[in-house]
Amino acid sequence: MTFPTLPAPIAAALEERGYAEATSVQAAVLQPEAAGRDLVVSAQTGSGKTVAFGLAMVPELLRGEERIGFVQSPLALVITPTRELALQVSRELEWLYARTGARVATCV
């Protein structure tokens, strides 16, 4: 499955990283019926879960815009069970949202 229409900065980040099409995990979280819902995903390492997680936040974070304007409080909070996973999520979100003006902070 190819990626659905995404804001240009997100699409460019995916293309730069070599993502030509969505993995099955990414496709599942991008389905319209998943929008705004809490999701539980279980899949093998390397299946694209972390990027899927970042893509699922696009509508809420960008709200149809290409950049995130100045905000005084966090727009999202990601809690992980381990330090290593927190750092992995942070790295993935940083490149995925780099062109949007988003700032990613990690507390471990």
What spans do the regions from the language model cover?
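Walker A/P-loop NTP-binding motif
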Residues: 27-39, 50-70, 79, 84-87, ...
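Conserved pre-motif I regulatory segment
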Residues: 1-42, 59, 64
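The conserved Walker
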Residues: 43-47
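Conserved nucleic-acid-binding Ia/Ib motif block in the N-terminal RecA-like helicase ATPase lobe
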Residues: 3-19, 66-108
